[in-house]
């Protein structure tokens, strides 16, 4: 019987492999030994001004050269794309890019979108992500392996372990730490399993955070945090590497805050806060001196609290983006729209969001490293890829120039990951991870949404085909 089954198993494996190859091929727009992208505008991700009428040569998965089209020569057999009217940007480096999505319920539940999110991230130009917290860590690790092997389409993934949460979690998808020893155990277990970063959460104690940071740093790994029980300055002194959500998550300005407890009234304290005060300036100085990066995640706050507007913060074109709504399941779409309907039209939330934006600008002005992500949680209106574009647009709304915002969303993330020699900007020798958009984001940042081709390791994927392949799936799988 075993002898008869072996040929059948081999046949089925071969059919499966062929199907996966065929599935990948249908989404490829361009693949060749040598590719020439001619007449293209280049925003290289370094913050430099755009360069017009450039030719980018791609070979072996890498950028071979960049130069003026008028003076660049290349072999006649190169696959040439004339990109007049288009802009090449580095692939985005998403630094708060979960693979899970809110499913509603009480208590709140979350499920991995292992089918839809990898394709959407890739389709919309996010070629590298850090998952920044996992509710299904084995799934995330396996997805990374499948993507790296070419069996699944998606971005390059840096896997963050399950949340390091203290007692009092608001959702059952998180393990609650027992003590500092439990934190050490979790860090070492998940580092052994393949996680490359860790995320402390809202109710962690100082002892637990210190233990996690010590164990992670012994292994050359970093710790970020969405904190509440611990203020930013305390966390920086403990040795945390990164803080998520900027000003929104800093509880240290609550007057009667108790150690190791997440206080009520954080938003109220921030509404009263003077960013020019000595306390805020000391926080910024401490973060910069301790080399603590901040992750900007403006879209999740906009979607959750900003009233609809014609443009700017709360723009209906962003919060009710039809292309985004189309990739949601009916249940997910209805749930989000119901949540949006509860947002007060007279909300003073916009002023708080403006203050958070000003804090991020002040942090950068002081020399801090600001990185970017979307955080696809909140009220269910933040979706892979679409939210990443909105984050860049909101950075411009915050007062950064378009090329500065693009740098924050690309090269800055690569620097934090220690990957700046490989990704994050368009330069000879780097991986050919690029997004090709119609228009000029340096003049009109919303053009970043007009993605047509995404190159990952030198292979150009059709953005629209990838998006169409996951219509109605977000909120299901």
Roles of regions detected by a PLM:
Residues 144-148, 209-220, 288, 361-364:
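Surface-exposed amphipathic alpha-helices with a cationic face
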């Amino acid at each position: 019987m075993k002898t008869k089954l072996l040929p059948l198993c081999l046949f089925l494996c071969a059919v499966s492999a062929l199907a996966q190859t065929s599935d990948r091929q249908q989404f490829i727009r361009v693949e060749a030994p040598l590719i020439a992208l001619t007449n293209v505008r280049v925003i290289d991700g370094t913050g430099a001004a755009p360069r017009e009428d450039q030719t980018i040569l791609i070979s072996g998965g890498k950028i071979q050269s960049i130069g003026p089209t008028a003076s660049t020569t290349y072999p006649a057999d190169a696959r040439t794309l004339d990109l007049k009217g288009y802009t090449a940007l580095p692939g985005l480096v998403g630094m708060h890019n979960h693979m899970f999505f809110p499913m509603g319920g009480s208590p709140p539940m979350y499920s991995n979108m292992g089918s839809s999110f990898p394709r959407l991230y890739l389709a919309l130009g996010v070629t590298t992500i850090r998952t920044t917290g996992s509710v299904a860590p084995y799934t995330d690790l396996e997805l990374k392996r499948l993507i790296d092997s070419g069996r699944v389409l998606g971005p390059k993934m840096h896997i963050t372990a399950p949340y390091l949460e203290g007692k009092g979690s608001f959702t059952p998808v998180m393990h609650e730490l027992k003590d500092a020893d439990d934190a050490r155990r979790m860090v070492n277990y998940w580092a052994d399993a393949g996680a490359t970063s860790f995320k402390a959460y809202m109710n962690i104690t100082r002892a637990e955070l210190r233990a996690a940071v010590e164990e992670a740093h012994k292994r050359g790994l970093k710790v970020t945090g969405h904190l509440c029980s611990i203020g930013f300055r305390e966390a920086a002194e403990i040795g945390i590497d990164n803080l998520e959500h900027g000003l929104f998550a800093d509880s240290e300005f609550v007057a009667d805050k108790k150690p190791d407890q997440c206080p009520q009234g954080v938003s109220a304290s921030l509404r009263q806060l003077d960013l020019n005060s000595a306390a805020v300036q000391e926080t910024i100085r401490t973060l910069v001196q301790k080399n603590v990066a901040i992750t900007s995640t403006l879209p999740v706050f906009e979607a959750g609290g900003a009233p609809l507007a014609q443009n700017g913060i709360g723009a209906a074109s962003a919060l009710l983006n039809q292309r985004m709504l189309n990739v949601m399941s009916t249940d997910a779409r209805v749930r989000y729209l119901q949540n949006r309907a509860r947002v007060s039209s007279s909300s003073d939330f916009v002023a708080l969001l403006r203050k958070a934006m000003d804090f991020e600008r002040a942090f950068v002005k002081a020399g801090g490293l600001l990185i970017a992500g979307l955080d696809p949680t909140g009220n269910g209106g933040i979706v892979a890829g679409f939210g990443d574009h909105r984050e860049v647009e909101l950075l411009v709304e915050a007062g950064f120039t378009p090329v500065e915002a693009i740098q924050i969303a690309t090269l800055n993330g690569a620097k934090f990951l220690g990957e700046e020699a490989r990704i994050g900007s368009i330069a000879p020798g780097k991986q050919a991870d690029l997004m090709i958009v119609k228009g000029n984001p340096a003049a009109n940042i919303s053009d970043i949404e007009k993605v047509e081709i995404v190159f990952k390791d030198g292979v150009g994927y059709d953005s629209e085909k990838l998006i169409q392949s996951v219509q109605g799936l977000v909120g299901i799988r």
